[in-house]
Every structure is written in structure tokens, then in C-alpha cells.
Amino acid sequence: MARGTGQFEVAVGVIGKLRVEGYEAYLAGGCVRDLLLGREPKDYDVATSATPDVVLGLFERTFAVGAHFGVVLVATCGGADTPCGAGGNSGEQEYFITEVATFRSDGAYSDGRHPDAVRYTKSAEEDVKRRDFTINGLLMDPLRNIEEQPQVPFGRLRAGSRLPSVAQDDKHPFAAQDEGIGRDNLRSSVLDFVGGMADLEAGVVRAIGRAELRFEEDHLRMLRGVRFAARFGFAIEDGTKTAMRGLASRLAAVSRERVRDELTKMLTEGRARRAFELLDVTGLLTEVLPEVARMKGVEQPAQYHPEGDVWVHTLGLLGQLEEGCSATLAWGALLHDVGKPPTFRRAPDRIRFDGHVDVGVAMGAEILRRFRFSNEETRQILALIENHMRFADAGRMKTSTLKRFFRLPEFEEHLALHRMDCLAGSGNLEHWEFVRERFEAMPAETVRPRPLITGRELIAAGYAPGAGFKEMLRAVEDAQLEGIIATPEEALRMVRERFPIDGGGGQVNE
């Protein structure tokens, strides 16, 4: 889906068309928040007094994805006024999706996620007051300063208008520059029924109305509140935080997939450390990841971990995760030492965690199963846990062993995890530098060369198929990786010398 100014224009066009037909319509929710923060929104949502049936009839290409909740998707191609399919093959056109939701009030939430019933309303204020947080409860009228221009179709932006530049840091919530439609026009176009503007300026995440009621309606809102606070560098308002602590146990009723997705966003938005600190102080961490919560207070040997306990060390890794990092690397960083708490032992010489890698792999597998990760993601995250201690042995590895180490899928993630692990501990990057230099210097074709021989050649050479083939081929590959042999002829000669055939029909002499 296309992003940016074009999508903004399309959303404004949708609003303009609804206005022409006599309905209220505004930009709503996260896109308003992000515009005011000087960030480029990922999506533009519209809230309107028009019912879903009206929206479906007004626009040529629509999808009633949430009709029960008053949600319709409007598809537009090539520009704010071009329906999909106009002027050619719609499959080759740039297209935009705008989510249009009817003003509504919600009934009871018996499942802790969806309202049992909704009632459409003509009141924008009533619609806003059912939402989660004040910073997400703002509406914006993008036509306020341009709707007097009749030459602009459906209220499209006048030529030359543009979004405020996206802030490159979080120095201040209103970091947008006064250009194009600008900060002042943005602020003057906002409808605020819940005090969201003041909370944006103060940097506060506050539930709309009674926090307990908002969290009873949708328990996942507690995790979303933590994520917003971490992402924007905001504080959680005291009453909202108290409600989170009191209702944390309600998260047990939320589907594991929804919890997983929210945690993954926390881990990959560039504020993972702050997010998990907030999960801890709100009591939510114990509910969603008790294995991670148990890292707190687990001492480590000071000579290797001067930073402190396992929890502090793990936070040190999370603090290094960059925005947009892969989910597998992020979860690998979070869980790499999950096996330490149950293996803690105070030995005569120092604190030890014997077998913590194997225990961690088993615990990680259970956590990932619980959160219903895909098989592919599970394999990669468990591989990161399983191999994170191997770097210390790399200098003593045979060349063949080192090359097989490099064959691990997404080996760059193993390098990244080990580097973070070192920097969150002693700071010694000696092993990381050794492995990185050799990995970068080693041509891919030498790490995974074509096999010199296969089972077919062994049969042709007189060997009977059997379990011994695996050992023979492994020995050949070892020699090839070590650079001892390089041709099929050398491979067969080595096999005949190391695995001679007896006189009884191709069996190998042991």
C-alpha cells in the first residue's frame, strides 16, 4: 500500500466527498496523533456520521471488512479522485486504502475485546469517548482552511501543500516544522473532546474516562498503552498505571497471538528497553512473560557481568535494538538468557549457570509455542539462543567447524546478538571481531561448496548403501572444508583409504 502525502490526499478526498453529501467526516485516531507529533502516519483513518450502507453506496470500490462495527475500506487508485480500474489495468496502478468508520457508541464487552453490540450515532464526541487513550481520541478537520476553495475537487489539498517534515528525533512532541499545512494549521484543525492535545504537549498516556472501564472493554489496551508510552517517550498517567496494575491478570483472557504481536511491536520500534521497564512497573510483565520477569534479582559473576543481574543485562540488549530490526533478532535478544534463573548455582569459585543454554532452548520453545510463532520464526529464535555462547569457542574451532557455524541461517543475526550481548556485559568484543572478520573474509562458495561425491558415486565405487554412507560423506566434507581435498578423485581415494571394503559384497571393514 502506498504511503505518505498521496495517501493523505486520498483520505482528504474521501472526507470531501462525504461532506459534499452532507455528512460529518474527520481524520481520526493515530494519524492525527502522528501528524501533531511530526511523524508520518502509516495509515489515515476517517470517522464519519455516514452509515456503512451510505459509504458503500458513495464510493465505487469498497470492502465491508467490519460492517458489524461500522468499518468500510475505500480503495482509490492513481490519485484522490481516481477509482480503481480507471485508465488501465488496476493491478498496475498505485492504490490507496482508507478505513472509514461510522460514529458509534459501544455496548458491553463480554469477551474483553469486542463490543457485544454497537449503536451508530451522529455525535463525533460520543464516538471519541469510547476510544482508548486521549492522544488517540483526537479528530482533525483537514478541510478547515481549504474548503472555501470550490475549485478543489472534494477538498483536495491546494497545489504545493505538503505535510510537515517528519521529525528525526523526539526532542519535543510538536517537532513538526511550520511549512505546508504546518503545525499551526494542524492544531487549529483539531477537535478535542478528551484533553488529548494537552496530554500530547505534556507527554502523557492517559485513558479516556475511567481507565478501569477502558481496560475491561479491551484488555489488550494495557499493552498498547505501554507501547505508546515507550514509543513516544511519554509517561503513563498515574490513574492509568494504577488501573493497569489492578487489571493485569485480565491479559490471560487475551489471545496469545494478539499479545505476541503487541510485544513484537514493542521490541522492534526502537524503544524496547523502555517498553519492558514499563511492563515491569505496571505488573504486566509477570502476566505475559513470567519467565522473563524471573530474571530480576538473579545475580551474575561480576568478572563477566559488571552491569548487574540477568534482568539488567537483558535490558542492556533491548536498549540496543534498533527501530525496524527483525522480530527474530529482537526475541532472540529477549530470550537468550532465559535459562539462567533456573540454572543459577553459587559454586565455590563463582556463580555458575551450568546448562543454561539447553534449558533456555527448551524454555524458549515453550514460550514460542505459547505465542504461536511460525515454525520458521521458532527455528531462528531457538538457533539464536542455542548458539549465542559458541563465539567464545570460535578461536579453537577447526576450519570445517567454523564454516559450518557460518552456515547457520541468517548468520548476521547471530553476529548482531553476540555483539549486543558483549556490549551489555563486559564490553569485550574480541570473540565477535574474530568471527566477524573471518565470516566477511570467507567466500560463500568455500563455506557451502558443492559436494565432491554423493551416495551414487559411493555405490558406483562398490559400497553397499547403508548407515555408513553418512559417516563417509561427512568425512569427505570435513576434508573438503579443511582444504585437504578438492576433487572427486581425491574424495574417492580418501574414502577407499579410510573405509576399505571387505571381501563380502561392498561392506565396510570396521
Model-identified regions with their sequence ranges:
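Catalytic cores of the polymerase beta-like nucleotidyltransferase superfamily
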Residues: M1-G160, P164, D169-E510
